[in-house]
Design a protein with these regions (language model features):
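Terminal low-complexity tails and localization/encapsulation signals of metabolic enzymes
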Residues: 1-40, 269, 275-280, 286-291, ...
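Glycine-rich beta-alpha junction loops
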Residues: 71, 170-171, 247-252, 289-291, ...
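Conserved Rossmann-fold dehydrogenase catalytic segment
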Residues: 172, 202-212, 234-251, 271-275, ...
Length: 457
């Protein structure tokens, strides 16, 4: 009888897929606690690098207070305009159609206050907020906040437990530190662009990434630093600390074997476009037919592309069977032979000729039947509409208090007990002045009104 009961219980156990779905369903996140609830973060940031760092902490439940310039807000609000100009009722800097979409990706879940860092009244506000905060995140030029009297050395005297994270392009010390930086500068000096794009003999040149990878990667690394510093404070030292993140340093950290290759052999890693210098076949080919020939979007009318990964000798043999070219399979049966530059040119040319009368979906179907790894190159529309990513919450519809219905990226990871979550996308400049400055800085309604009239907040 006991065996029958145990067997029935085992039979009712969910599959691993069912268990994961039940455990990580993003729609249930708001019924669970937050990992960083009670942690207060002061975000004195602009553009993407600093704001994304603070926002990653906000996804985990930290109370992130974003400080912007009065009236105008920070610069990213003025890129890629959207349609709510009412966010700028008192400013002559009103964007033509409102807040930029570029602002959304790096600032969800934050509280928004305005404060002029240059003025004594604004600096006094920062000090009051820092005294009651766990973390300050800042990405102005190195030493700027120190000159204003609100840098780490000044604020740590007010709050010895404060974790202060400075992020910037070239670091706070060294001969190149004084330059300003953006993502594109960081990737360029860090060596990333030098390895991206087609080589000259293919008609190519170094290529930049459309997505600001160095900024978002850097923001994540900054968040890791902060979490480590908080752990050290709470479990070991009892004191805060000062952390620095260099955008260029972070890019260099991602260069794989490029630096060891140069250091040991004096060889500069080359650009190799959509192919791979180490593996073949392991790259992107062009398919000759569009998947959406009737689309009104010009980019969708273009030919499609697909990634094919068949560098294993057995996989390559099957790929040649699909293509119908036994001679190439025999000639390049071993990986050492096909990974050579001239061999790759010949092989990829063969593949593109084979795909010239096919869409990327047709190519994928043929490769799937042969059990060959592949993935059509998707655009943002295809990602947004795919049921897998919708079900997992990678793409979410958000009923935002400012935008209304808004499609937005969800958090990139999942946690069973304390899941990250998306609460709101943004708010107007200074939307939380009364709540935050009244509660934490102790300012009365009369003081808030006076500071607003003086354009200090």
């Amino acid at each position: 009888m006991a065996q029958e009961t145990a067997g029935a219980a085992q039979a009712k156990q969910p599959t691993f897929e069912e268990f994961c779905h039940q455990t990580f369903d993003f729609k249930k996140a708001f019924g669970k606690p937050e990992a960083l609830k009670g942690c207060r973060v002061l975000s004195c940031t602009q553009y993407i690098l600093g704001p994304s760092c603070a926002s990653y902490l906000a996804e985990l439940g930290a109370e992130v207070i974003k400080i912007e310039a009065p009236r105008r807000g920070e610069a990213m609000r003025h890129t890629t305009p959207f349609n709510e100009p009412f966010l700028y009722p008192l400013s002559r800097w009103v964007p033509e159609r409102g807040t930029g979409l570029g602002f959304l990706g790096a600032n969800p879940n934050e509280y928004f206050i305005s404060c002029d860092f240059h003025r004594p009244e604004g600096q006094a506000i920062v000090k009051k907020l820092a005294a009651k905060s766990d973390v300050v995140v800042e990405n102005y030029r190195p030493g700027t906040f120190e000159r204003w009297g609100i840098g780490y050395r000044q604020l740590s005297k007010i709050n010895p437990r404060l974790v202060y994270c400075w992020l910037g392009g070239f670091g706070g010390w060294g001969p190149g530190r004084v330059r300003a930086s953006y993502d594109i500068l960081g990737q360029s000096q860090g060596g990333n662009f030098g390895m991206t794009g087609k080589p000259e003999f293919m008609g190519g040149a170094p290529s930049k990434h459309t997505i600001w990878l160095a900024d978002y990667w850097g923001g994540m690394m900054g968040a890791v630093q902060i979490l480590a510093a908080l752990y050290w404070r709470d479990k070991v030292s009892g004191e805060g600390t000062f952390t620095e993140y260099s955008q260029v340093h972070g890019v260099t950290r991602q260069l794989e074997y490029a630096l060891p290759l140069y250091g040991r052999h004096g060889i500069v890693r080359e650009r190799w476009g959509n192919w791979d210098t180490q593996l073949c076949v392991h790259g992107i080919i062009k398919c000759g037919k569009s998947s959406y020939p009737q689309s009104e979007n010009p980019q969708e009318q273009e030919e499609g592309y697909i990634l094919i990964s068949a560098y294993d000798d057995k996989d390559f043999a099957r790929l040649c069977q699909v293509v119908g070219d036994g001679k190439t399979a025999e000639k390049y049966a071993k990986h050492d032979a096909r990974v050579k530059p001239q061999s790759q040119i010949e092989i990829y040319d063969l593949l593109e000729k084979w795909a010239a009368d096919k869409t990327k979906e047709q190519v994928a179907e043929l490769l799937d039947k042969a059990n060959i790894n592949n993935q059509p190159v998707w655009n943002s529309k295809e990602v947004a509409n795919h049921p897998h990513w919708q079900e997992r919450g990678a793409v979410q519809w958000l009923d935002d208090q400012t935008f209304g219905d808004l499609m937005h990226q969800g958090p990139a990871y999942m946690m069973s007990a304390t899941p990250p979550r998306l609460k709101w996308a943004l708010k107007p400049v200074g939307a939380d002045n009364e709540y935050i400055l009244g509660k934490l800085a102790g300012l009365s309604s009369e003081e808030l009104r006076r500071l607003e009239e003086q354009e200090c907040i």
